[in-house]
Amino acid sequence: MNSLNSFLSEAQKNRHAIGHFNFVTADVLRAIAEGAKEAGAPAVMVGTSEGEAEFLGMTEAVALVKAMREELQFPVFLNADHFKSFEKCRQAIDAGYDTVLIDGSKLGYEENIVLVKQVKDYAGDKVAVEGELGYLRGSSEVQRKVEISSA
């Protein structure tokens, strides 16, 4: 199977997206993967937040995704979604996640850069690493804490 980076490069070249959906149960994972395959998507990314990873277990999430990938013969990639610490990212990398999003958005810019570099150095070339600077509006947590104008 091709790497996540090859699918993302192809998606960018062809101006389409690779969907990303979080899951916390095997049933939800199956629905996501089967739906993406039936819709003709080239691949799909599934993720666990820190809370979902704690509930499900990181090694269990990796095993579920690997089994789904093999059963469906369809590229399903697992993302550690908005993990807040190096330690949690390290655990996800060691467990076998395909990609991690280290969310240092509550840190200052320089501290955030240091954190992202620390995770990338640990991950090497085996796991894709994404960093977040600032915050993205739209998360339910952000909507509860930040007043959003309807204008």
Residue ranges: model-predicted function:
Residues H20-K37:
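N-terminal glycine-rich phosphate/pyrophosphate-binding loops that anchor nucleotide-derived ligands
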Residues V46, G51-L56, D98-L115, E141-A151:
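Glycine-rich tight-turn/loop motif centered on a GG-T
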Residues E38-I93:
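Active-site cofactor/substrate anionic-group-binding motifs, chiefly glycine-
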Residues A17-N22, V44-T48, V76-D81, V100-I102, ...:
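Hydrophobic faces of well-ordered beta-strands that scaffold small-molecule active sites
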